[in-house]
Amino acid sequence: MILCICEKPSVARDIGAVIGATTQRQGYLEGNGYWVTWTYGHFCTLKEPADYYPQWQQWSLVYLPMMPERFGIKLLSDRGIEQQFGVIKSLVSQATEVINCGDAGQEGELIQRWVLQMAECRVPVKRLWLLESLNNRLVGHRGEPQPLHRHTALRHL
């Protein structure tokens, strides 16, 4: 199955209607060889200093600068986000391909890439570049989904 991940439920419904994924499931739509799921804004954030080292919980000049070897991300602590992320992670683990249908631009790209990283995505990812989705008719669609490497520059914020 091909998994489409949208940035919001309304876009998922619009895309689902276009590609024939109209059967409602818990946290996603299904049909015609596709799963269409969604986030709702930011699901992930950068880790806090204490997430790296417990001694960084309290700010002290002794520990400055606080520079981890590698910056990490974590899922936001929210029951709804955790539940929907569980759906996404399960679908990612079963998908043969993922299509990033996040909002156009750097922020939309970052939201989707962090979710895919947290979900440990190991299948090919493509990017569907949408400027707007309206009334089950995709507007501003620039062709077929493209390999993700064509949009690599967007991840450099």
Where are these regions (language model features)?
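Intrinsically disordered, low-complexity regulatory segments
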Residues: M1-L157
